[in-house]
């Protein structure tokens, strides 16, 4: 019987806790972003074979069994109750509040399109503000994807049907 995603994630988080390392420290040791490390340990991203030895060196308690599990394509999903967690709620609120303006600036700078969440990098950093207080910096670094004009002459499935 296959182990559930939440069970594997729980085991992975236990390995992280045992290590005493932060996501940032693990990221430095593996060459990944801190958010990607968290995604790996929560089974929201797939561990690539060439990264596995670096992650195992950073987290020596990672078993070969867990590494193999992490290399399987994950079920990228989330608990629908997660929105109730205050940090996640405020992040969602910020995106909703600034979303229309961000969309307009993307369109102004790039044209009609979107920012990919597939070809995407994300990090969380801590800086001091001008007032000396801690500030959170979230970086979303996604590939620009233009919307395409849907011309039937470019639709491969139709071209194949016409050629038959």
UniProtKB/Swiss-Prot annotation:
NCBIfam families reported for this sequence: cynS (TIGR00673)
Which CDD domains is this protein grouped with? Cyanase_C
The record describes the protein's role as:
Catalyzes the reaction of cyanate with bicarbonate to produce ammonia and carbon dioxide.
Assigned EC number: 4.2.1.104
Q: What is this protein called?
A: Cyanate hydratase
Going by the entry's taxonomy, the superkingdom of the source organism is recorded as Eukaryota
Q: Which InterPro entries match?
A: Cyanase, Cyanate_lyase_C, Cyanate_lyase_C_sf, Lambda_DNA-bd_dom_sf
- Protein family: Belongs to the cyanase family.
Catalytic-site annotation from UniProt: 90, 93, 116
Q: Which reaction does this enzyme catalyse, per its entry?
A: cyanate + hydrogencarbonate + 3 H(+) = NH4(+) + 2 CO2
Per its UniProt record, what HAMAP family does this chain match? Cyanate_hydrat
What is the species of this protein?
Answer: Vitis vinifera (Grape)
In terms of Pfam families, this protein maps to: Cyanate_lyase (PF02560)
Q: What class of enzyme is it?
A: lyase
Query: Is Lyase one of the keywords?
Result: yes
What are the GO MF terms of this UniProt record? cyanate hydratase activity; DNA binding; identical protein binding
Supply the alphabetized keyword list: Lyase
GO BP terms, alphabetized:
cyanate catabolic process; response to salt stress
């Amino acid at each position: 019987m296959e182990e559930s995603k939440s069970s594997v994630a729980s085991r992975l988080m236990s390995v992280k806790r045992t290590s005493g390392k932060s996501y940032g420290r693990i990221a430095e040791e593996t060459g990944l972003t801190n958010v990607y490390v968290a995604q790996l340990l929560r089974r929201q991203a797939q561990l690539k074979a060439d990264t596995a030895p670096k992650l195992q060196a950073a987290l020596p308690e990672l078993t070969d069994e867990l590494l193999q599990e992490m290399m399987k394509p994950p079920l990228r999903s989330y608990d629908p109750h997660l929105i109730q967690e205050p940090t996640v709620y405020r992040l969602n609120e910020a995106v909703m509040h600034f979303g229309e303006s961000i969309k307009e600036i993307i369109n102004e700078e790039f044209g009609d399109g979107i920012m990919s969440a597939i070809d995407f990098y994300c990090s969380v950093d801590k800086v001091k503000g001008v007032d000396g207080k801690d500030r959170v910096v979230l970086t979303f670094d996604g590939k620009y994807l233009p919307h395409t004009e849907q011309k039937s002459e470019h639709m491969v499935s139709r071209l194949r049907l016409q050629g038959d």
